């Protein structure tokens, strides 16, 4: 609590009617602290006989009382200063926990959350990489599937072409079989016609006479027919064997191609089924990864929102603590300023006390018994007093006595 001190100014001018007129240089001197001491206790050194009267005794008593009050006030100020120091010390001790709050738990929590966020981010990145790899694998499988599908279509087109060739060969075989049957029927017809002609000729020859003539040997028709038949049969057999051999060869080749194509088709079908299963599994896994990513993103968003709110609360707490710290610092600065003001007041009071002490010590000097031997302020001897002091101290202007004034008293008092 600040103390405002107003140093009193003592206007202690006594009436000059109680003593002889003094020269103009013997007026009252102003002391430090704005207190005017009467001329009879001043440092003018113009003392006449009987100058230390009752008013001056009252002034000295008043000064002693003021000195005692100053000393008491100094002690009171020292006690107040000690109380203020104790109060400041207690306040500082009470505010110490607020000055340095412990945020280690918050820091640990923040570090753990940061580690979790980093782990979540790394897991999210790993899942993204896995998803990208799965997409690339799916693209590869899709490309392979398209390739195998094109190969399958080519094989199916080849199989269809071979089937058409097989149908053509079957038709050709049926045509050849029909030709063989027609040739067999024609051969039978020729045989029957030949037998009929032979029988007819035999009948005709049997009715005739046997006339032997010398002529060229006749042609054996049976032999010729047999040779012709054997030639045709050999030709037909050769053609048949060639056709059968060609048909067998083509059939075997077609069978081999069909078997290989069927095997390839089965392998392709198995591979296609396996690829479909893989694609389905990858799609399911991709959907699961998408769901996991969405859940992780939601969890991350919730964690960020929750920890941002906690961080804002911690920040507000830090702001409040900083504001309290600023208030405490301002209070400490204000109390320090008040303490400095009190120290200044104490120093001024000590200076005034020293001044009053020097004045009191100067007043303790022995007063001269012979007023005519009194020296002035310049330590020069003063001539003997005349019977009429007013005539000896006549200034250039006529001397007019001072108007009577009331007894001096303190002008101001301490204001707290």
From Swiss-Prot:
GO CC terms: cytoskeleton; cytosol; extracellular exosome; extracellular space; intermediate filament
- Other comment: There are two types of hair/microfibrillar keratin, I (acidic) and II (neutral to basic).
The Swiss-Prot or TrEMBL record describes its family as follows: Belongs to the intermediate filament family.
* Coil 1B: region residues: 103-203
Species name:
Homo sapiens (Human)
Q: What is this protein called?
A: Keratin, type I cuticular Ha1
Q: Region Head: which residues?
A: 1-56
The region called Coil 1A is annotated at 57-91
User: Where in this chain does the entry annotate a coiled-coil region?
Assistant: none
Which key words are in the record?
Coiled coil, Intermediate filament, Keratin
User: Which Pfam family would be a valid example here?
Assistant: Filament
Region (Linker 1) residue ranges read 92-102
Could you tell me which residues belong to the region Linker 12?
204-219
